[in-house]
C-alpha cells in the first residue's frame, strides 16, 4: 500500500514505512506530479518549476538525470509504476496510491480534519493551492485556525 502525504510536508510511505529519495529535486519532482493529480507535466513546465533560474538546456539535462534517479529509487521499493513518462512529459498514476490531498478534496470524511493549513510548505509553487484547500476546509469543518 502506497500513501502520499502532502499536508504538513511531502512524504511517501510504502506499507507504513517512509521511503527515501536520492535527492531533494527527485522528491520535489514527484511532489509536482502528485500535485497535478495525474495530469501530464511537460518537460518545459517541470524545468521551470524545479530549475527556474538555470539555463534551459542545462536544466532539461538535470531533469532527465533526476527522473532516472527517482525511477531507480522507486524501483527499490517496488513502486516505480506510479510514474508515467511519455515523450516530453511526466505524470503519476493516481489509481496506484492513496493521497491525503486527493481524499480531502474528494470529501472523504476520514481525511476532513487532517488539513491544518499547511500543504507541502517546503515548495513555494504549492502555495497557489492553499487558498483552495482552506476554502474546502471551511466548507467541511467551519473556520480554519
Stretches found by the model and what they are:
Residues 1-145:
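Intrinsically disordered, low-complexity protein-interaction/activation regions
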Amino acid at each position: 500500500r502506497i500513501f502520499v502525504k502532502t499536508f504538513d510536508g511531502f512524504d511517501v510511505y510504502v506499507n507504513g514505512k517512509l521511503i527515501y529519495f536520492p535527492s531533494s529535486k527527485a522528491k520535489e519532482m514527484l511532489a509536482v506530479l502528485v500535485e497535478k493529480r495525474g495530469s501530464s507535466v511537460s518537460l518545459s513546465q517541470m524545468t521551470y518549476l524545479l530549475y527556474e533560474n538555470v539555463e534551459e538546456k542545462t536544466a532539461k539535462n538535470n531533469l532527465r538525470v533526476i527522473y532516472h534517479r527517482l525511477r531507480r529509487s522507486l524501483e527499490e521499493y517496488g513502486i516505480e509504476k506510479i510514474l508515467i513518462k511519455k515523450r516530453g512529459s511526466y505524470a503519476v498514476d493516481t489509481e496506484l496510491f492513496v493521497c491525503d490531498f486527493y481524499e480531502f478534496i474528494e470529501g472523504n470524511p476520514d481525511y476532513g480534519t487532517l488539513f491544518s493549513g499547511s500543504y507541502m510548505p517546503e515548495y513555494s509553487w504549492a502555495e497557489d493551492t492553499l487558498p483552495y484547500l482552506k476554502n474546502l476546509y471551511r466548507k467541511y469543518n467551519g473556520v480554519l485556525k
